[in-house]
UniProtKB/Swiss-Prot annotation:
Residues carrying the site annotation Reactive site: G25
Protein biosynthesis keyword on record: no
Keyword Acyltransferase among record annotations: no
Carbohydrate attachment residues: N45
UniProt GO cellular component terms: extracellular region
Induction summary: Expression is up-regulated during infection of host tomato.
Family: Belongs to the cystatin family.
Compartments where found: Secreted
Stretches that traverse the bilayer: none
Positions occupied by motif Secondary area of contact: 68-72
Protein known as: Cystatin-like cysteine protease inhibitor EPIC2B
Highest taxon of source: Eukaryota
């Protein structure tokens, strides 16, 4: 019977990790330099945009981040940013004095296939 204790403890921890902090499948995450680098890499590369993503913005700062584990990972960046007129202006804003708004940028990453896609850019609610 004592061999069941570690197994039950592992199951309890797994259930806790699986269910904790999930709202619509997303969990809040502290923004790391690696997360910001991922945002910059995807958001500044127009070929990484899904064809239905027509918004073009630069970002001033990352306000917060949520992640969702799927067949890879979805990153929902809540950013302050500005509309831009050309793909050359994507990524971090060169003009720090632009008229900013709040946006949500969702990036899908699957590291084992080197997939990095901007799946949506929407005005934040």
């Amino acid at each position: 019977m004592s061999f069941l204790r570690p197994t039950l403890a592992l199951l309890a921890v797994t259930a806790l990790v699986t269910t904790s902090g999930q709202l619509n499948g997303y969990s809040k995450k502290e923004v790391t330099p690696e997360d910001t680098e991922l945002l910059q890499k995807a958001q500044s590369n127009v070929s990484a945009y899904n064809s239905d993503v027509t918004s073009r913005i630069c970002y001033l700062k990352v306000d917060s981040l949520e992640t969702q584990v799927v067949s890879g990972e979805n990153y929902k960046f809540h950013v302050s940013g500005c509309s831009v007129n050309s793909d050359k202006e994507l990524g971090g804003c060169a003009n720090q004095n632009c008229e900013s708004s709040k946006y949500d940028i969702v990036i899908y990453s699957q590291s084992w296939t080197n997939t990095l896609k901007v799946t949506s850019i929407t005005p934040a609610n």
